[in-house]
Structure formats: structure tokens, C-alpha cells
Amino acid sequence: MSDTILGKQGIDPRVVQLATQFKADQGPELQQMQSWLSQWGQPTLSMTPGVEMPGMLPDQDIAALKNAQGVDASKRFLTGMIECHEGTIAMAEDEIKDGQYPPAVALAHSISTREQQENTTMQGILASL
């Protein structure tokens, strides 16, 4: 979703800044989690169409974002990212509660805290558009 919004013109600068930040934050986290899975002999994460995870947006919402412009695109991005973050927070909270590998639990704490803060920021921006 970040790549989609970053490829558009007329997007609120606060939204562009968030999308850029999301890409910077999530890349290393995903690499770390995939590295752990690989070390443990487990399959790595996949973004296979049709495979659902908490917070994943339906294809029609992604298509609507791709077709949207300006303020509408900004609103769709923020709404979708809030939903995505809520799913990520739920998964992180599960890891915090049940996780057994301390580095993964620590990463889950970091992700949960950051994404809760980001949701507050996104809700504020959304209310101002």
C-alpha cells in the first residue's frame, strides 16, 4: 500500500511521510522475522493472494486505493493502514503473551507500541482531511 500511495501525485505530505516511514520500519522487521523462520527450518512469510492474515485488506479495497486520487487516496490509504496496523497489533500482542523466543517477544513489543502510536497519528490526519 505504501508503494501505491507514494506513486501518486497530490497526496497530503503527512501521508507521504508516513508511507515512507512505514517502508523504512517494516523492511528490516520482515527481514528479521524471515531470518528467524529460515534458521528454524520453517517456511518464510508469503504475501500469496488468497492467503488471509489479520488486518489484510480485501482485493477490492486495494483496487479502490489504486484507482483513487488526491484526498480520496489519502483517506483510503490511512483507513486501510489503520486496519492493517490493528491486525499487526493483534498478532504482536499474541506473541507478547505466548512467545517463547525473547528476541521475537521484544520485537513484538516494539511493533505493538510503534503501530499503536502510528494509528493515533493516522486517525488525527484522517480527521483533518
Regions found by a protein language model. Give the residues of each.
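All-alpha RGS (Regulator of G-protein Signaling) helical domain and cognate RGS-like helical scaffolds
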Residues: 1-129
